[in-house]
Amino acid sequence: MKTYAIGDLHGRFQPVRDFHLRHNTEKEYNKADKFLILLGDSGLNYYLDSRDKTFKKKLSKYPFTYFVVRGNHEERASNIARNNPDWQFENFWGGIVLVEKEFPNIKYAMDYPAFYNIPYIGNHEHDLTYIWRALVIPGAYSVDKDYRLAMGYSWFKDEQLTEEEKDVCLKDIEDAHYKCDFILSHTCPCVFEPTDLFLPMIDQSTVDKSMEQFLGYIEFLMDYDCWLWGHYHKFRDYPRTDGKKKIMLMHEVIDLEQVYKEDTVEVL
């Protein structure tokens, strides 16, 4: 059993294909059940037409069960599933996910913050399974919202968390005693925003930072081992001044077990 994570795909299957081709001759890779966490803006529910289905079919060629964290450039799975018999709820990783019947290997995390139990082999000699407790926080603000609206491109009005969803998250982390192993999100706490990557044509005074500020509060409250996010289209392994691992991903793939156990991050 192996669990990996990757950042934004934006409808491109090639990073997944290339990762698989780099490792499909390895014995350990081939014998393991493989899970791939997509950290938002995957492009699976972007066009809401046959183009999405084509992308899902391409991803389904590869031997992964996908766990999808919602970003900002995609529709909420719960909106698509509403009154749609082709979608159903499932129990997965100790939580609830949405699944489209045609693509049972693609599991969509809830559109609100939720905890999941990610299984891993903690003792390979005796094949003993343990779990990581993971807090999943979806959503982000689209800095190119006005451009998208002007050009007729997709923009999703409920891309960010609602205040009610944030309140539920705060209650959930209190119930969890403010502790988990992983935090998985699309955007990141405000203190970790890569300002050097901000688009120069965007007036930052017009950007809604409420999601990043909320995540900053979560970061202050939570005792965690590793936080993974995407959104900014760059790989970055942040300094660990407090001992916590903070990793930003784009097309890079990482192994959660390696990241959890070791001080360095190996890009696969």
Ranges and model annotations:
Residues 6, 12-128, 204, 210-212, ...:
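Core catalytic region of metal-dependent phosphoesterases/phosphodiesterases
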Residues 8, 36, 41, 71, ...:
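Divalent metal-coordination and catalytic microenvironments
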Residues 10-11, 43-45, 73-75, 139-143, ...:
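Short, solvent-exposed loop/turn segments at secondary-structure junctions
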Residues 1-4, 114-136, 182, 240-248:
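Beta-strand-turn-beta hairpins that frame and shape the catalytic cleft
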Residues 1, 31-33, 63, 129-131, ...:
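A general structural motif
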Residues 90-98, 121-209:
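Active-site-proximal loop/helix segment associated with metal-binding centers of metalloenzymes
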Residues 22, 81, 216-221, 232-268:
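Binuclear metal-dependent phosphoesterase catalytic core
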Residues 43-44, 54-56, 67, 181-230:
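Cap/insert and terminal regions of metallo-dependent hydrolase folds
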